[in-house]
Structures are given as C-alpha cells and as structure tokens.
Amino acid sequence: MSFLKQALMKELKIERDFEVYTTYKTGFDEFDYRNGFINPETKQQFTGLREGSYTMVIGPSGSGKTTFVLQTVVNMAKPFKGRTIIMHYDLEGATSPARIMTTTGVTEDWLTEHYIKKDNGVYAENFYNDIVAHAKLKKDNREDLLYESDLIDNGKPVMKYVPSFIILDSLALLMPEKNLDEEGTGSNISAAQAAKANSSIFKKLIPILGKCNINLIVVNHVNKAIQTSMYQPNQKQVNYMKQDESVPGGNTAIYLANNLIKLNAKAAFKDDDKYKLKGFPIECTIIKSRGNRAGQSFELLYTQEYGFNTPMSKFNMAKNAGVVEGTTYLTIPGYDKKFRNSEFIELYKDNKEFKLAFDNACKPLLESYLSGVGSGDQVKFAITDDEINDIINKDLPEEEKKSKK
C-alpha cells in the first residue's frame, strides 16, 4: 500500500479499500447468470441480485411483472427462514395470499411469519419514512440481525445484516400526499410533481438500502410515449427501450436502479404446443445491469395458474442452445435414457440422476453468460446450494431425508 493511500485511509477513517458484497439467487437461473460476472483472477462467480440493491421491473399490463417480483423475492428470502421480512406495498391491489402461495410454493405459516402487505394510505412521504424506520430497527437490533457470511476479508468471516425485502407495486401510483386536494382525488397532481417527489426520495434511499441490506424491488409500467414532434422521433428514455415506450415516475428512479428488467408477453401457447403448458412465453430483457452486459434478452415460460415455471424455462433455454438434443425423443449428456418434452418436469422433480445430469449439462452454458470483468467488488454467494437444501430438508422425516441422499 502506498504511503499516500495509507495516509488518506487513516485520515478519512476508511476501513477497507472497497466494500465486500454478497449476492442472492432469484431462482431464475438464466437471469442470475446473465446478470452476473466472474472475477478473472479469482474465478469467483457473482450471480443474482446484489445485497442492499434497488431493482426496477417494467412491462406492459399482463406481462407477469408482479408474479416475477414475488417469486424472485421469496426465493431470495427462503434461506433466511425466521429472520427476514418481506414488506409489500401493493398499491394496485394485485396480490392475495392465495396467489402468493400458489406461485411461490410457500405455506400460510411461512407468509404469516415473513410477509406484511400494505395497500391503503401509502404515499411517497410515508413510504420513505417506513424504510427509514425499517433501517433504524435493523441498526438498533444489529447483533440479533447479523449472520456470518461465507465472505472472507483479511482472514476473517464478514458479518452481514440478514437481508430484508421491500416490494413497491407500482411506482406509477406512488404520489406525494402533500399535493392531494382536500377531496383526496389528487386532480391537481402533475406528473412533474410526482417525479420530483420520487427523485428526492430515491436519492435519499439508495445509501440506506445498501447500509442495512434492504433490497428494494419496484414494479413499473411501460406506456406509449407521446410524440412531441411531427418531424423528429422521440429520444429513447433508456437504451434498449423502444422510442415509443415511456416509463412513468420520473427519470431519477430509473437511473438509480442497479438493475432495470423489462418483461413482454408473447403469443399464448397453443393446445398442441410441445411443452403442454397453459400460458405464454415472456421475453425478459435486461435493460440495465451493473454486473453484466445490458440489452440481453431471453425467454421465461409463464403459466396462468402457477406463474413462472423455472425448470421449464431452463429446459427451454437448454433446448434452444442445443444442450438438449433430439426432436421427439431427447437426450442430454450424462443421462443414458431418452425422454419426451412432456416427461421433463416429472423427471427433473423426481429423478435425482436426471436432475444432476441436466444441471451439469446446463452449467457451461450458464457460465458462458457471465461477464468476464466485474465491478471490482468482492462478491460471493451468501449461501451455498448445499446449505439451501439442508434448510429446505431439515424438517423432513428421517426416511425422506435418506431417500433424497
């Protein structure tokens, strides 16, 4: 370390050269890797969403935004059973406990322990104040809310706040209370006033989120942009969006996001579709990423009843990339039996040998999506797959535990 660097760190009371971060898996493997990177020196892989970050998910009506966010947040929260919380500001009234249980697989008891929904009386001011109070509560109970991550800094494990999660659905409906008229209709609120309030709030929130490991995921809409000139097309609000697309709530809330994800529904599956799913594919585009290349698009498979089918989405990825070969009868490396499209889910769910072979076959493809150069932050998974499986299986009867080994 140079003399000047050492002196500055001492003078400015900087403890580390750079902060060390963990990441959390969303359960959407292709997204996690396309949003991740690998350190070319240490070969560490950094996938998923970074701790204490802010993500915005946008799309037109009916594109599965809320379901995507709920499945993502629950998947990130599950490893921290009994210690984390999901605070859901459902301004659109789009979610019910039954829908959450159906799409995420959690129980009513799990929701009771980890989930709070607020859908009335939410304004920009008290939304901000709630998050400030949330952060203060974590700071005041710091020792009870720390966990030992698998990050090592100067030979010692790094202690982290247990992650907590906030969902805002949606930014388009977040308005400042002080501008409401007496009747409460909000008729005198302009888009500019709302954008100004959001700008102030989000600028102040970002450091709070990072410091206390509060993970904010915001749902927003994609609207038709108003053409302002007869002679010149509109400038894109953000790269990789279309010129005729507009996202409400102000530009600051967009630019401050660590990740900006756009969902767009495609034509529904036909009854004779090869996957036998009742739903439709959804194009997921990473409009903005601070860990990987922006502009990447890929498909996720969505069903009306159960939300995003993550195993089938991974299977679709593998087929399109040639990892799975064949037409009627299919093969994968490491598994000597052929199978049909319609048999995949049951095999993946119930056949340990098949699941292992399929996941191993997909691994090189997923790793090829990682960016080769990261931000320089030291990042590593907060929890391993084996630890997740131990947590999931710990309450199973001994007979079931043995059968899963």
Model regions: which residues?
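A structural signal for short, well-ordered beta-strand segments and their strand-loop junctions
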Residues: 88, 167-168, 217-219, 262, ...
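Phosphate-binding/switch region of NTP-binding enzymes
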Residues: 191-321
